[in-house]
Amino acid sequence: MSHWAEIDNNNKVIRVLVGDNNDPNGDEGYKWLIDNLGGTWIKTSYNGNIRYNFAGIGYTYDSVRDAFIAAEPDNAIGFDENTCRWIVPEIEL
């Protein structure tokens, strides 16, 4: 299956849709999205093999890194450029 994230003018993800599994390259799915829904769509991967992270509503698409990045959590202590994920302290139980 192909997964597509729609982003707004601020590169924020506003929705994520699933495409047909019979479209291996995603070209037909992308064309359908543009023709029927308009907007700006970026392909995302559920297993994170492209664009680092699976897009979620509220994530930001960073075109320089070509990555979907979650909103920074309040307890973030840094950002890992290798994974495009926020570093948060481990919670001890």
State each model region's role.
Residues 1-93:
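Interaction-interface detector
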